[in-house]
Regions:
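Donor-sugar nucleotide-binding helix/loop cap in glycosyltransferases
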Residues: 2-306
């Protein structure tokens, strides 16, 4: 059983230093026409400021977050954006969470950023590669820069760009406690997850352990997403892979061993035996039967909101 080599694209900008806000993904979603297409001009024409009710830089930020959180993607023709299937299920009128009120919606956005690392290299690095439990931004900048350089294909990266990206990432989970700006004081979408806290000024620590707002169904959804991303074709995974592997639910959700094990114990009942936990002769593994992963994902995502 081997972990598929990571192929993370180096992407450290686009958000204009604005952390993801609560209703921004919904705002982007609402721009779609009846055929699920969003014109690129929606984010760049003269009416964009009035359409979104924010400044031009924030409009650019909303577009970035909608792409990074996989609300929309660029069409193959690169002429327009098209809504993602999961986004349609979540944000549509009558959908699972049209007003972005459920924690699962924030967990899904976090998974896209820190689990998949799409347009969010620093997010993936912070939750998967960084081993420090407590840190300051200055302390971890050199290791981020080294990681960024290793995946950039020789492209020179600005230290200032990396520093802004890291600050935006951290503030998205642990916002500044004092701010003169109303927008800055608004609660970032991911802060409610309780993954990161500012212990004292400039010193941050991960909150590792059980996550009460993370549903078992969404954990199962994320597990299979991770499985098919890095272990496609394998019929079993070790406990260590699920708890500690790069891009794994254990790392991305900052679960401790006990919390991860508790989630795995209940998978057989939750999934009607499609996923089964085994602890035989000290070998802890999770097994999967032969099932339609896409259909399974749709069922688990729906149950995440029930």
């Amino acid at each position: 059983m081997t972990h598929k080599e990571l192929h993370i694209e180096a992407h450290f900008s686009g958000h204009e230093t604005f952390p993801l806000r609560q209703m921004w993904l919904k705002k982007a979603f609402e721009q779609a026409e009846t055929n699920s297409i969003i014109s690129k001009e929606t984010f760049s024409d003269d009416g964009a400021i009035a359409t979104f009710g924010v400044g031009r830089n924030m409009v650019s930020s909303i577009k970035h977050w909608a792409l990074a959180c996989e609300v929309m993607r660029e069409d193959e023709s690169k002429k327009y954006f098209v809504l993602d299937e999961i986004a349609r299920k979540i944000y549509a009128d009558g959908g699972y969470d049209p007003y972005a009120e459920y924690p699962t919606t924030a967990w899904y956005a976090h998974w896209c950023l820190a689990g998949r690392g799409s347009r969010s290299t620093t997010w993936f690095w912070l939750f998967n590669v960084l081993n420090a439990q407590t840190f300051t931004r200055d302390e971890i900048m050199p290791t981020l820069a080294k990681f960024a350089q290793s995946i950039s294909g020789g492209r020179k990266l600005s230290q200032a760009t990396l520093a802004r990206d890291l600050e935006t990432c951290v503030r998205g989970y642990a916002p500044r406690s004092t701010s003169n700006s109303v927008e800055e004081a608004a609660e970032p979408m991911l802060a409610e997850l309780g993954l990161l806290q500012e212990e004292r000024k400039g010193v941050y620590s991960f909150r590792r352990g059980p996550k009460s707002s993370l549903t078992d169904a969404f954990f199962a959804w994320a597990l299979v997403d991770f499985w098919d991303r890095y272990y496609l074709g394998e019929t079993s995974l070790t406990f260590e892979a699920v708890a500690y592997g790069l891009g794994s639910p254990g790392r991305v959700f900052k679960l401790d061993e006990e919390s991860t094990a508790e989630r795995l114990f209940g998978l057989s009942a939750l999934t009607d035996g499609k996923l089964k936990w085994s602890d035989t002769a000290g070998l802890r593994q999770i097994y999967r039967s032969d099932f339609d992963a896409k259909a399974f994902a749709r069922v688990m995502m729906k149950r995440s909101y029930e």
